[in-house]
């Protein structure tokens, strides 16, 4: 589910919220109470967010954030990090003329890459699609300072990472972004995205402003999605997050031990309740490291499928509050048997 189903499939309170919302209607031409309640929950939860604009996906949220940054700064260029992911849409795809890509973790490159042509710097607390590799907090803070030094906005992509801390990873890492991207868990398993941040930036999209930044979408803030997202966030308590993260830590330790004991070494990278399993025994500290041993990675994926364990082909695992001790034990056994199969 690529981090979206924090409470698992068909979580009863979310299913009930969707059903109750659908009875009232699905698409309205103006604001709906469920949208307001979801926005209020996000604002209360994420310190950097004064206002929220809803979209239909994380990719749409990233595109809107860039449009806001360009309007606010009068600039065009954006900066991302090698191995980062902010949606498979231009200009966030490789080869775009206005996109500059920083080498992962290279603080020295910040001063070389950032200048008065840059509208925004986009960063993830960890590289989600790049192998679940946490970025160094000092590097993230340096990027924020460098962006502000040249008058650019600092945008933190919390599409995946929001689930890992009660107030989001940006707050946990003492970051103060201008804009925050959100999706996945804030929709309770339905399509959603959101841009939150400083009031003066979000107000650029207000239709009451002359020459406002146009942002429209028939299904933005869909009634059922907003209702599902509200329940998803309300049920993701501090205690639930702590328990999930502890399960993930134990699972990571078990997987590495299973591989070492059975002769098929594995390295696990992790951020909160999101893990990525990599073949080999060398540390995985960069996106390049995460792409080693493609045949072994494919073989592990298949071996796990044969044991009834589904991960992404690149080895990502997302835990949910729906997992029982029996479920986790089954995952442990699945990795044990998969490693035995591959080592033989």
What feature does the model see in each segment?
Residues 1-344:
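Conserved N-terminal phosphate-binding loop of PLP-dependent enzymes in the Aspartate aminotransferase
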